[in-house]
């Protein structure tokens, strides 16, 4: 299971899926921080994704590189402590290029509830599923 989190530490760009009116919505997000089994993200409060998450916090993410893909799902929460917000802003330089200060964004966490780890390299392919 930890190899799935390690994979996302190395491959931070993920497809980030939300649901609105029973329809899927995808966009590319970057995993900003991982602590334990919690993933952290940041976005603008003006973006559609923020509104979607406040209306329905269920999300699924998918990261892929080569023959390996990792899918995780759970519910988003917006109660990220200020210390973690500042850490995210300080350690992800893309944010300071886009936003004037750490508090110009909203931060959210995903407490992962399910993981699928796929590796198509071995024969037969490896699929590991974890419910947390």
Regions found by a protein language model. Give the residues of each.
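A short, Trp-centered hydrophobic/proline-enriched beta-strand micro-motif
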Residues: 6-20, 59-63
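General beta-strand recognition
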Residues: 15, 38-40, 71, 116
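Conserved beta-strand in the GNAT
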Residues: 29-30, 71
